[in-house]
């Protein structure tokens, strides 16, 4: 028999991305370049993770942080150090090689995520809308965090690129001067995980 305490000890899988007002999440778009306060928030967020799970495209974008750049300031070096220190799992059938502190996964993502949830504590982060769509379809994402920026892109990749889950808002927070973080959980999970928030 599994106790409630044991269930809560499972690591939480979070899907978090910057998003425009019209719902697009093109990660490399110049309008999403974070201001200092938001970048500091991201540094601390990455430091607190237990690991990261990426799709191919998002991992290739984030590999920018695997090598130092001459024009970096102190905070860029901080972020890079935090990112490099985290274990990463890269879901791809086409990649043949990956960087340090990363594991390539070609099949059975369901078993991978369930195993990581059982082994790790705290929070893991899922990166990339296509991967997140597959994980949503499997019912594996515990929280969705939208960093809503005051920009309109007009087109691009949507935050939800696959199934459209039933969600409930569980938190909202102003991050920096003009970015709002909206946190949603699958509606079916809210009564058990977040019931104390409404007391």
Language model features by range: what are they?
Residues 2-199:
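Enzymes that bind and transform nitrogen-containing heteroaromatic metabolites
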